[in-house]
Amino acid sequence: MIQVLLVTICLAVFPYQGSSIILESGNVNDYEVVYPRKVTALPKGAAQPKYEDAMQYEFKVNGEPVVLHLEKNKELFSEDYSETHYSPDGREITTYPLVEDHCYYHGRIENDADSTASISACNGLKGHFKLQGETYLIEPLKLSDSEAHAVYKYENVEKEDEASKMCGVTETNWESYEPIKKASQLNLPPEQQRFPQTYIELVVVADHRMYTKYDGDKTEISSIIYEIVNTLTQIFRPLHIRVALIGLEIWSSGELSKVTLSADDTLEAFGEWRETVLMNRKRHDNAQLLTGMIFNETIEGRTYKSGMCNPKHSVGIVRDYRTRRHFVANRMAHELGHNLGIDHDRDSCTCGANSCIMSATVSNEPSSQFSDCSLNKYLNYIVRYQSTTRCLHNEPSETDIVSPPFCGNYFKEVGEDCDCGPPANCQNPCCDAATCKLTTGSQCAEGLCCDQCKFTKKGTACRPARGDWNDDTCTGQSADCPRNGLYG
């Protein structure tokens, strides 16, 4: 059983509250000061891990008490995660660090169904949380009092550049492409219209400009990337996509592919490097270049649309424009969205927020939600183009998960029948969120051959025909949709 650590935060208001202060996120005009004070609920004398599996924080925001629930993100790293950097003479140095007891968490605010949180607890509390529709950031204050933290709204951070930023992917003409089809129009029964579980094993590369920008501090660069991917995993979870960091590379001795003012040329060169070099030494599904280059034409990122799983095109480049990790994570999620066949949003697309992830114009306050258009486009893409996205269906072995099984992390592990997330978030009637077991009378909880918690009747089509191949059909004995391999 997971022990819960209770942490009380006492809110103090100081004379300089509301004045301007320079933080890692930039110049902040209005903030509150809090002092985290741990009050442990672990039994007296019990061994306390360095970073607990679950924590709660109580504090006030705008004078109102909130309770922040955090759970360690046990999907952050893939099994054979590695880190690579280069000696001054260009020699490759690869290590396999132990990452089980890391300090990166996801969470939510109690009694706020739409809340989210992505927090690093490595050195104090650092990250962001969404409360009542507004994004707040928290980070330690670099004062003589090391316990002081600042809490502030994202909108109160002064913008470095108010110029409109754009995604580098060419704006598509929606009418010129295959129309987006609603889930109900994909010739799939209702129970199969849920997103299939897919997996992206991700490599993030920091270029040499990033290395020099952070004064050669590889630890700092690694922490930045951890924070970005921690947010990525949360963003893609509603699509049933597990994003796991399988590799981190820092070009410490110089650029290994051409990085120029042209985003197109930089993307092409990085794709060629991935195809000819990286794929030969590291198994992965997608690679993203995080660069310190300021591209021409206010380009924030560039990628190949529908390039996922392609040796050269399953790549993206993202500019490390700000020190705000949430902003950069949003940009990387945007480029990954294009890799997954998702177009820019039209004006009519909505996500319940001021901006959505696939907006063509970069918002100063990044979104963490995909629009209704994006969800439909992704579902259409993943169902109709399975033959070109097979890398996404390589489910990691349940025995290869880095950390011990953890009910409530959305990932089915050894000893579990299903995992639909925390009880407050579970929407699967076939799965008991408290135990990660099937509910009484259920045969299955998900899968292309799972119909209202029962195995679909034998012979039911579960995957459309591909070229000269027949439809794949259910066996009646499993929720999986086997590849029949029969010519028509």
Swiss-Prot record:
Residues reported in the UniProt entry to bind Ca(2+) 1: E201, D285, C391, N394
Natural source organism: Crotalus adamanteus
Residue sites binding Zn(2+) per the record: H334, H338, H344
Peptidase M12B domain segment(s): 198-396
Catalytic residues of the enzyme: E335
Disulphide bridges, residue numbers: C309-C391, C349-C373, C351-C356, C407-C426, C418-C436, C420-C431, C430-C453, C444-C450, C449-C474, C462-C481
Taxonomic lineage from the root: Eukaryota, Metazoa, Chordata, Craniata, Vertebrata
Placement of sequence motif Cell attachment site: 466-468
Protein name: Zinc metalloproteinase-disintegrin 8
GO MF entries: metal ion binding; metalloendopeptidase activity; toxin activity
